[in-house]
Every structure is written in C-alpha cells, then in structure tokens.
Amino acid sequence: MKFLVEEGSYRYIMSGSLLGIEMKDLRSAPVGYIDIWEMYPLDLEEFFGAVGVSDTVMDHIKESWNGMKPVDEVVHAKLMSIVRLYLIVGGMPAVVEKYLETNNLQSVMEVQKAILRLYEVDIAKYDPNRKLYIREIFNLIPPELNAKNKRFILKNLNEKIKFSRYENSFIWLKDTGVALPTFSVEAPTSPLALSRSRNLFKLFQSDVGLLAATYADGIQLRILDDDPDINFGAIYENLVAQEVHCHGFDLYYFNSKKQGELDFVVEYE
C-alpha cells in the first residue's frame, strides 16, 4: 500500500466489514499512508433524511431541543411513526435502499436475513477455531436482551464455562462491528473506564433493524402499530446503544440495588 501511495497515480479506498480485523493482524501499519474511518449504519437523523423529513422539520426539532420546548404535537406524532419504522428497517444501507425502492417490509426482511446469513459465513471464514462460540454468542443476543435486566449471562451458553474461554469471541464480535458490548461501571463518575467491569455487560446488535429481523414474523407490523402488548424495552435500548456508539461514545451502564439503574452512562466534555 505504501508503494502505491508513493507512486501517486491514484488514491485508494479499501473497505470491508472485517477490515479492522485484517488491519490488526498486520505486523506493521504504513503510518502516514493510511487513514482509517469507521462506518456505521444510518443513524436516526440520517434515516429521517432518507425518508424525506424536510430540513425545516429538522430545524424545528433542534430549536425545540435547544430551547427545552416540546415539539409540535402533529410533528411529534409523525416523527414517532418514523422512529417505529426505523426500529424495523434499521440503518443498513442495502436495507434502507430496498425500503425506499419497494416500500415493502417483507422485501426489507429478506435483505436483513441475507445480511445475517452473511454474518454467519464471515464468522466461519475468518475465525474457524472459535466459530461455534462466536455463533452461539451472536444468536443469544436477542433472547438475552429480552431478559429483565438485559445483561448477557454467560451461563446461558454453558453453565460450566468460564468467561476467559469466551472472551476473545466477544472481542471478535466487537471488533468486526457486529455487536455492541455495553459494560457495567461500579459508579457513574469520570473516568468511567476505571470502574468498568470486565465481565458484566449487555450485548446489543450493531443495527436495530437486524435485531427486529430476528423476531418472529408479524412482530414488525405490531411494532409499526405501536402495539401496547409488546415489550419495547429491548429494541428501544438497542436503538439508543446504536446512536450513542455511532456518535463516538464508549458504551457503559450503571446498576445498583440501592440507587437504581442508568441504562446508559455517557462521558461527555
């Protein structure tokens, strides 16, 4: 790569969902010749733009936020319907494109399930030694998020297994951008990293639409209709994790029997 850049005829872009893993395996990186940019699914604001929410409406939202005032009720109702749509479609570019082309949720789910199948192929291809562990963890994300405290319980994989045996599999899922670990902190005080627990965490999907695609068929329409019988906790919490992560913040949460729980704790200067 260094030679090609120095030759100067072209500029090069390398891309891939697992490029970060490949780069970490390099013995030396060509410092000064490569800029690394991490890409994310479309966030909620970008999704608003994709489905045609006008700049005027977006400005109204920002003004309301900055002035600590409620958004107009009609605007609020419309935006919440788009939020529920985002819970189903998510932000994967191919999925959003399919929705805009077809306006068909069944077509959307077909693309999402194809992406999930490709994840399994990538797991087997890039880490054959740990593929069973990684696949077990990945497949356990939806039911673990549906549990009361949403914390990932390692014993649900194997009662006798130790965290150290699975740790590299969690790291692999994080480094590939497939999953978003959110670590427990002993206290919601800065710096959060100093009180981070190594093995107490929640594990979210990197895209809320892919999480919704793992649910039973028919749930998607109930989400769109804001069905009061559905527990929206897991899917909304996944949405927040995705938003916080794509804006550059590390993911933490705080839980205390005496003080209560903070679903997310953000270190912001």
Go through the PLM ranges and name each one:
Residues 18-22, 41-45, 186, 210:
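Conserved nucleotide-binding/hydrolysis micro-motifs of P-loop NTPases
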Residues 2-5, 29-32, 222:
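Glycine-rich, phosphate-binding/catalytic loops in enzymes
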Residues 1-13:
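Conserved Walker B catalytic segment
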Residues 13, 35-37, 87, 204, ...:
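Hydrophobic/aromatic beta-strand patches that form the interior of the parallel beta-sheet core
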Residues 11-17, 38, 47:
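Structural recognition of the conserved hydrophobic beta-strand(s) that form the central parallel beta-sheet
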Residues 97-268:
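Accessory nucleic acid-recognition modules appended to NTPase machines
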Residues 23-146:
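Interdomain motor-coupling "hinge/lid" segment immediately C-terminal to the ATP-binding subdomain
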